[in-house]
Each structure stands twice: as structure tokens, then as C-alpha cells.
Amino acid sequence: MEYCLAAAALNGVDRRSLQRSARLGREVLERAKRRAVDWHSPERSRGNVGVLYRQGPYQERWSVPGSQRLLGEREERCPTLSSSFGAMAEFMDYTSSQCGKYYLSMPEEGGATHVYRYHRRKPPEMHMYSDTGHSQEQRNCRGETSVGQESIYQTSEHSQESSWPTENISKDLYIEVYPGTYSVTVGSSALSKKTHVVAVDPGQSVDLVFPV
């Protein structure tokens, strides 16, 4: 302390100001030592905010409402990889729903385009009729892009109704993906599914034809 005072005197700092700064610093340190957040407190405070109470003449604690219950639930549920990804999927689904609601409220055409492009969940159905007109077959035509265990489904923009035979009906799908290798599967049943593996480079456009 004396060394600091001597150095301060040489630098033109007032001795009284330096002592006052040291005293204030010690007071702040003592107050910080007396305060702590008690997450395991057996007492539960009322209301929605933490309550400051004194345990002793020189100690103060913050009681967080419901903290013991939350910690107990976390300890009971052992975190696993599946539960972690499940929680992430729930948050992403909620975020997506809120995003869709926001863009649905926009009067501009861009809002409807955004919702159609990113927030559609059910693929449109394509109705096809036989030549006799007595039987009706409904098929869900969807393009499936799979990477590992994850799949991204893209649907066509408009459903088509026609009395032509099945082999004369065509459907175009446009899918935007990041560069990489993808397995593309198309089909409405396990027997009719057809798969192509394609490698996409940056800026490359790949055309795939599936006879369905």
C-alpha cells in the first residue's frame, strides 16, 4: 500500500483520492462476498421474482422460485442424444409455426410465397381416373431427398387431374439443395419407389427423370 501511495505521489495523484478508491473497492468486494444465488434452497419464495433474505448477520441469499423443482426434474430425466434432438425439433417446429403465422399476416405476395415454400406440411394429392371412369386412384407424388437419416420433402406446385393413362402424366419438381451427394427417392409405395444417387457441385443443376 505504501509503495502504491509513493508511486501515486510521483504521478501527481492525490493521496486522499487513492485511499477513497481503495476503501470503495473493499466495500464492493465485501458486498459481493455476502451475495449469492441459492439454487438449492429448500424454501420457495412466493411470486414470480427472486426474494432476497438474510441467513445470518453477514450473509445474504437470493431465493429463485421453483428452482428446486426444475433441478429435480432435470436430475430425474437423464439426457440422451434422442431426447436432445427431440427437444431441438420441438423448438424448431415452434419457431417455424411462429414464422409461418408472421408471413401469413403479411398482405404482400412475398408472404404467401414464403409460407408455400417453407411451411407446407402436406403434399398435394394428384387424382387420376381410369378410362372407364368408375375407378379413382389417388396418389401422393412427392420428391424425397435424403441425407443419412434425415429427409427433406418437396412437393409440386399444382395438383393435376386428367383422364389420360398414367404413363402420359408428367410432374416437374424443383429442389434447391446445398452442394453434396444426395439420394433421391420417388414413389408412393415400397414396390414402386425408384432411387437415384447424385453428386451436386456448387452452381450445378442436375436433371433427374423418374418413370412413375
Curated annotation (Swiss-Prot):
- What processes does the entry annotate via GO biological process terms? regulation of non-canonical NF-kappaB signal transduction; substrate adhesion-dependent cell spreading
**Keywords assigned by UniProt, alphabetized:** Nucleus
Q: Name one GO cellular component term.
A: perinuclear region of cytoplasm
Q: Does the keyword Nucleus apply?
A: yes
Q: What is its main location?
A: nucleus
Signal peptide residue numbers: none
Please state what the protein is called: A-kinase-interacting protein 1
- Localization terms from the record: Nucleus
Q: Which gene encodes it?
A: Akip1
Could you give the subunit structure recorded for this chain?
Interacts with PRKACA and RELA.
- Source superkingdom: Eukaryota
What job does this protein perform?
A: Enhances NF-kappa-B transcriptional activity by regulating the nuclear localization of the NF-kappa-B subunit RELA and promoting the phosphorylation of RELA by PRKACA. Regulates the effect of the cAMP-dependent protein kinase signaling pathway on the NF-kappa-B activation cascade.
Q: What is the lineage of its organism?
A: Eukaryota, Metazoa, Chordata, Craniata, Vertebrata
Give the organism the record lists.
Answer: Mus musculus (Mouse)
